[in-house]
């Protein structure tokens, strides 16, 4: 099964179980959790069920395309369901079956691994899912987002699309993944991986990036003051990505790192609080029956 087909199968599977299928959010981010479809919608009492592919950028993970299993740009398949179904593990195993993986024929383990994203004040309890010794999915029951309690608790499933497809295709390198029967993953992304790694570690301008962080922070704060939730979140995400670029460049000390993360987290909390306030003022309009089965 090629990479394109894996995505199509997961879209069909989760759509059939009541999930809204949305498109990737067009701001750089290090994880699908930071999309408003997850970060904001996990808050408050309104039900929500969504699935989407999210391109992720983690500048420090770049290896110029030389590491067969580690890229600084990759894809996650993100699922968020609120409230969490009681049988979510069984539903997940069914999703593997549609990809041709029969759980009874494989060593599938749920390994306890609590998750945290300190920059946006998000954390949860859950597991890594290991398939014959390789991690392919992260299960997280969200406890907080933006430093606010998640009530009810949402379940987030994050599939590692490259790892999952490598397993299905029995290949040993991301670049060798069959994308669509004609082109490989390397045909699509290898040159970009080389150039972006060069940018992340060598060609970026730290002085300019520090200035950009400050400007993005100012813009985020004034948007929050004007009670503009989504534009405010956009600029919080820009701050987060700019911080990651500075971190990859090695120009942020341990002390500075903690301070920068705290600044981002404080803005993320303000956005989350504002979102909840606005939804409450609207009377939480999505409070109606919605289920995933």
From Swiss-Prot:
Belongs to the class-II aminoacyl-tRNA synthetase family. Keywords: Aminoacyl-tRNA synthetase, ATP-binding, Cytoplasm, Ligase, Nucleotide-binding, Protein biosynthesis. Its EC number is 6.1.1.14. It comes from the Bacteria. PANTHER family: GLYCINE--TRNA LIGASE, CHLOROPLASTIC_MITOCHONDRIAL 2, GLYCYL-TRNA SYNTHETASE. Transmembrane segments: none annotated. One of its GO terms (biological process) is glycyl-tRNA aminoacylation. It comes from Acaryochloris marina (strain MBIC 11017). Pfam families: tRNA-synt_2e (PF02091). Gene3D superfamilies: Bira Bifunctional Protein, Domain 2, Class II aaRS and biotin synthetases, domain 2. GO terms for cellular component: cytosol. This is Glycine--tRNA ligase alpha subunit. Tetramer of two alpha and two beta subunits. SUPFAM superfamilies: Class II aaRS and biotin synthetases (SSF55681). NCBIfam families: glyQ, PRK09348.1. It is found in: Cytoplasm.
């Amino acid at each position: 099964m090629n990479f394109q087909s894996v995505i199509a199968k997961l879209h069909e599977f989760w759509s059939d179980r009541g999930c809204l299928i949305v498109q990737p959010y067009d701001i750089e981010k290090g994880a699908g959790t930071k999309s408003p479809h997850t970060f904001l919608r996990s808050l408050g009492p309104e039900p929500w069920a969504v699935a989407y592919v999210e391109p992720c950028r983690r500048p420090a993970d770049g290896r110029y395309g030389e590491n067969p299993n580690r890229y600084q740009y990759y894809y996650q398949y993100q699922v968020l369901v609120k409230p969490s179904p009681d049988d979510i593990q069984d539903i997940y195993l069914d999703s593997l079956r549609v990809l041709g993986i029969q759980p009874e024929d494989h060593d599938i383990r749920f390994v306890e691994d609590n998750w945290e994203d300190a920059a946006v004040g998000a954390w949860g309890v859950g597991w890594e899912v290991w398939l014959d010794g390789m991690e392919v999915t992260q299960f997280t029951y969200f406890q907080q987002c933006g430093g606010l309690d998640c009530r009810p608790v949402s379940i987030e499933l994050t599939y590692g699309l490259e790892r999952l497809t490598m397993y299905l295709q029995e290949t040993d390198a991301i670049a060798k993944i069959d994308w669509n029967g004609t082109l490989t993953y390397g045909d699509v992304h290898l040159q970009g991986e080389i150039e972006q790694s060069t940018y992340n570690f060598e060609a970026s301008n730290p002085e300019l990036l520090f200035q950009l962080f400050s400007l993005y922070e100012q813009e985020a704060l004034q948007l929050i003051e004007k009670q503009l939730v989504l534009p405010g979140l956009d600029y919080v995400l820009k701050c987060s990505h700019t911080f990651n670029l500075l971190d990859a460049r090695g120009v942020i000390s341990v002390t500075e790192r903690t301070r920068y993360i705290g600044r981002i987290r404080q803005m993320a909390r303000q956005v989350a609080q504002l979102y909840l306030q606005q939804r409450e003022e609207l009377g939480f309009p999505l409070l109606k029956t919605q289920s995933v089965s």
